[in-house]
Amino acid sequence: KNGISEIISIIDEFNNKKIVLFGIPGAFTPTCSEEHFPGYIKLYDKIIERGVDNIYCMSVNDKHVMKSWLISYSDDHKIIGIADGNAEITKHFNLISDKTKNHMGFRSSRFVMIIINNQIISLKIENPGELNVSTAENILKDL
């Protein structure tokens, strides 16, 4: 948050809030960097206008990679990054994706969820290699 890395509890962080959480396979990867994340930057205000408290982007990357990737866009976007370095959250939600054939290890599936008061209201998971259901444009339809 605000360029500062800290350990958080997502249960505490998401408590009594309406959250959009989207997951990406990896920071600095082409689709994530050129399409998925920029779409949320572009539509941030429209999503927040629908009563969303915060937008989070999660990836199975360490905090240093995630921080560098987030600030590579600008210092003024408001999307909060979650570095799930050990894939604990990703595994908990059963959103792990085996990318070992591509020499990328285990990553997050590409997904988006709406969470209200720590309850998942909507979850959309992309088919491997696709970017359709988890875009910012599509999440606006569900809000």
List each language-model region with its residue ranges.
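Chalcogenol-based redox active-site neighborhoods
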Residues: K1-L143
